[in-house]
């Protein structure tokens, strides 16, 4: 019997090792798997490379992980916000490495990994500092820069509901990077508000099929993470 549901955060996260590359879903705090991140902090893993759209907000979620010093590098498109002071302090002190990737390129590079593609050409970033040292190509009169896929050891994502086969449905904007990140990791761990019985999820509403998910863990979101 296929049963990908995990009883505890520790059970779901136990495979994560030091030095892992981890995709973390979310657009700011919307769709951020805060409880999975808290569980990762408790495990005490270190030398992590994190791939996410942002670099954390306040002292919550991803910022909380950064504050522990467990992250050696972050790959993101929007590292600085009014409340990104944790990342800002670490970066200015030389305690974290940053790779900035334009948001569209970030999504495309993750998608490329999930689809099993090799490097992709994109016009975004050509002629800027972000393209330095990368191969370029002129195609049909337009210049492109070559970008590598972003493949990860693990993906931590947040969905609305899931079943024991790993099928997931999302809620509104919380969906964001979740579906493509689930495809681009060797192991995908999804936190959900509820694990429902097989057949309860309308197949037409399933966005991420279970083939891309290895663990589903139900969590009760804290007030700070209760929003989509």
From Swiss-Prot:
GO BP terms in the entry: beta-ketoadipate pathway
Pathway(s) where this gene product acts: Aromatic compound metabolism; beta-ketoadipate pathway; acetyl-CoA and succinyl-CoA from 3-oxoadipate: step 1/2
Keywords: Aromatic hydrocarbons catabolism, Transferase
Family annotation (SMART domains): CoA_trans
Keyword Protein transport in annotation: no
Coiled coil: none
Reactions it catalyzes: 3-oxoadipate + succinyl-CoA = 3-oxoadipyl-CoA + succinate
Superkingdom of origin: Bacteria
Pfam families: CoA_trans
Binding residues annotated for CoA, in chain numbering: 25-31
EC id: 2.8.3.6
GO MF annotations in UniProt: 3-oxoadipate CoA-transferase activity
NCBIfam families the UniProt entry points to: pcaI_scoA_fam (TIGR02429)
Subunit structure and binding partners: Heterodimer.
Similarity comment: Belongs to the 3-oxoacid CoA-transferase subunit A family.
Name of this chain's protein: 3-oxoadipate CoA-transferase subunit A
């Amino acid at each position: 019997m296929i049963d990908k549901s995990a009883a505890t955060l520790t059970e779901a996260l136990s495979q994560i090792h030091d030095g892992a590359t981890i995709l973390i879903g979310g657009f700011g705090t919307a769709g951020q798997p805060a409880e999975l991140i808290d569980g990762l902090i408790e495990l005490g893993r270190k030398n992590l490379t994190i791939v996410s759209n942002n670099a954390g907000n306040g002292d919550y979620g991803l910022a909380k992980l950064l504050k522990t010093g467990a992250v050696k590098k972050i790959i993101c498109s929007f590292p600085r916000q009014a409340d990104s002071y944790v990342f800002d302090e670490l970066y200015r002190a030389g305690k974290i490495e940053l790779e900035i990737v334009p948001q569209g390129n970030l999504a495309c590079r993750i998608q490329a990994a999930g689809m099993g593609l090799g490097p992709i050409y994109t016009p975004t970033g050509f002629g800027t500092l972000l393209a330095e040292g990368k191969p370029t190509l002129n195609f049909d009169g337009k210049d492109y820069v070559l970008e590598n896929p972003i493949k990860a050891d693990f993906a931590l994502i947040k969905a609305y509901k899931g079943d024991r086969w790993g099928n997931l449905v999302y809620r509104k904007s919380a969906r964001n990077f979740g579906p493509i990140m689930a495809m681009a990791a060797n192991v995908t761990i999804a936190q959900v508000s509820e694990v429902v019985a097989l057949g309860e999820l309308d197949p037409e509403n399933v966005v991420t099929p279970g083939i891309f998910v290895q663990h589903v863990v139900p969590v009760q979101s804290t007030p700070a993470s209760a929003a989509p």
